[in-house]
Amino acid sequence: MPLDQISGYAHRGLHTPLFSVVENSATAIRMAVEAGVGIEIDVQMSSDRVPMVFHDETLFRLTGEDGRLSFMKAANIESVKYSVGTDHIISLEDCLNLVQGKVPLLIEVKSHWTGLPEMEQGLIDVLKTYDGPHGLMSFDPSIIERLKKLGSPSPLGLVTAQCPSKDWPGITEEQRQSGTLQFEKARELEIDFIAHEIGDIQNPYLSKLIQDLKIPLMSWTVKSSAMLQSANEMNAIPIFETDDDRLRALLRHER
């Protein structure tokens, strides 16, 4: 199944506070597989170079524990329990064993822009025997560039967004408004897909990029039926996160 042949991707799995299901957890991943929707997860490296499924740099928000994930060994990370529910942090390999190719998987590689040692070969090693539909993506173009140089067989994409001044000092207002620096990098890297922020999904420079490269467009994070409509208008596949029954019904209807 190609990455664009799905109604949507559950952002960090199907998680909800109502049932004590935490983002990026094994339960959230299982629920998405059972619902038949694609899954978007976050991955970063342990200190011993094992890809772990977790979003934040530090453990505290989701576990109540102190510590930075990239400074910990995988075995220690896997023993950490989330603050709610019964799940522990899992590895990418655990996630692949849960999904088993039943639905497409988008793997966002977190670099946190910290200049940590390269992680790309570890990702390639874990994914080399996985036959299920999946793609690797990152905000950090240097990660995608290194994956390409290492010959990663996985589809590779960029995560892009609006360019607020505080995050993009030193660029012109035109560059900030258009997002052209990101899109130029996407062209240079010849990416296989792009995931762009829903609030900027109708950016004409983005439309031109998609038209020229003829690649799938995903949009994050869709949290309402109005946002879903905006994504649909641009033929963007939603990366969604919601307890909105109406939105889930719309996604089911489109499948």
Locate each region found by the language model:
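Phosphate-group recognition and catalysis centered on beta-loop-alpha active-site segments
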Residues: M1-R255
